[in-house]
Amino acid sequence: LTDKPWDARAAAWLVSPFINSPRVMPNHFTALRLLVGLAGAVCFAVGDAPNVAALLIVTSNFLDHADGELARLGNKGSRFGHYFDLASDAVVTIGMFAGIGIGLMQSPLGNWAAIMGAAAGIAVALIFHLRYQMENRHGKSATKQAQWAGFEAEDVLYLIPLVTLSGALVGFLWAAAIGAPLAAIFVTSQYLRSMRTESPQP
């Protein structure tokens, strides 16, 4: 438990009452995470309630840990549940960037906002696809994120409410439009290295 990031520890505490429940399964939390995340993406796209959108995305990001913790602690994991979790992660993250881009089309960025959101979303889609391939070939350890003092890189999403409250969503979109493709290039290089070093199958 001590090796887990802070949000995963909190999620483990949240799901602990349901460990032995036959009615509450990890997929229920995954579905809730997906619905809440998509609601956040839609709110960003509408553009009238960015603070609400940010809170929904943060909640969805936290719930992303609940399904995995319940699966591990309650021995309720399944192959479908794992794929459902991965797909939900991708859909919510891509939807968030696309929603931000659409919502900012009325800003000085104009149509470029949608293009920037699409660029970030496509880059994220590529990252999820390549990480899925690496995990299938080399196990989950191949895609384990680095931690710093109990935080992971993806925890930056918890700062989104500060971004919306400070009116810095345009700057966030710029950072995503540049940073996500750069991250995709890095993950692509990891994937290609893993392909070159993969042991030949007997």
Residue spans for each PLM region:
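The feature identifies polytopic integral membrane transport proteins across all domains of life
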Residues: 53-54, 79-82, 141-147
